[in-house]
């Protein structure tokens, strides 16, 4: 079986040059309902990114100000932030053996990661043809009115939720 991974970023901008706040990831098998596992989650040092000219948008700061306190505190708090080099090492190590890389809108998460990898002079740990978009898949089925959602905008919880939803839709569409 191929290994699928879901990645999600929380950022301070919607541009490819965005400052990254947090990175989340889970590995999963879309062909069954086994719990997503091998979670990856960390917070990235903001000052080193702004020093490199990475983007912060006022609209995004304003948006963060509207989020529940526990969500914005987790994303914006100062504790336990890792360097950009450490971020790249962590993502690269976690990505070993992954065949398919999912996210909700590749022009966001993977565009930002690709941009920062290039800025730091590193190749990305995926090929363009390995990228999948959960948003496209989700648009193929009617929205579930009973869908319960917690922890939105926590990068790890978003990944878990999106991976579970991919599994559910593969089953619904009888994708084998």
Model region roles, listed by residue range:
Residues 125-145:
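Short, flexible loop segments at boundaries between secondary-structure elements
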Residues 5, 10-103:
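Conserved non-catalytic scaffold segment of RNase H-like nuclease domains
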Residues 1-2:
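Short, Lys/Arg-enriched N-terminal segments with co-localized hydrophobic residues
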Residues 90-93, 111, 115, 139, ...:
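Residue-level signal for well-ordered alpha-helical scaffold segments within enzymatic catalytic domains
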Residues 10-12, 26, 105-106, 111, ...:
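Anionic group-transfer/hydrolysis microenvironments
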């Amino acid at each position: 079986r191929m290994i699928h991974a879901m990645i999600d970023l929380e950022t301070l901008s919607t541009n490819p040059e965005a400052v990254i706040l947090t990175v989340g990831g889970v590995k999963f098998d879309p062909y069954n309902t086994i719990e997503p596992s091998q979670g990856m989650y960390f917070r990235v040092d903001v000052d080193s990114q702004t020093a490199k000219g990475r983007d912060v948008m006022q609209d995004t700061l304003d948006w963060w100000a509207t989020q529940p306190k526990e969500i914005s505190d987790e994303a914006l708090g100062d504790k336990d932030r890792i360097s950009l080099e450490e971020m790249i090492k962590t993502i690269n190590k976690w990505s070993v053996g992954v065949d398919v890389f999912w996210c909700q809108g590749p022009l966001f998460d993977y565009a930002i990661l690709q941009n920062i990898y290039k800025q730091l002079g590193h190749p990305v740990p995926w090929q363009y043809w390995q990228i999948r978009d959960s948003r496209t898949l989700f648009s193929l089925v009617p929205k579930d009115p009973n869908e319960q959602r917690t922890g939105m905008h926590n990068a790890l919880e978003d990944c878990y939720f999106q991976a579970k939803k991919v599994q559910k839709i593969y089953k619904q569409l009888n994708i084998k």
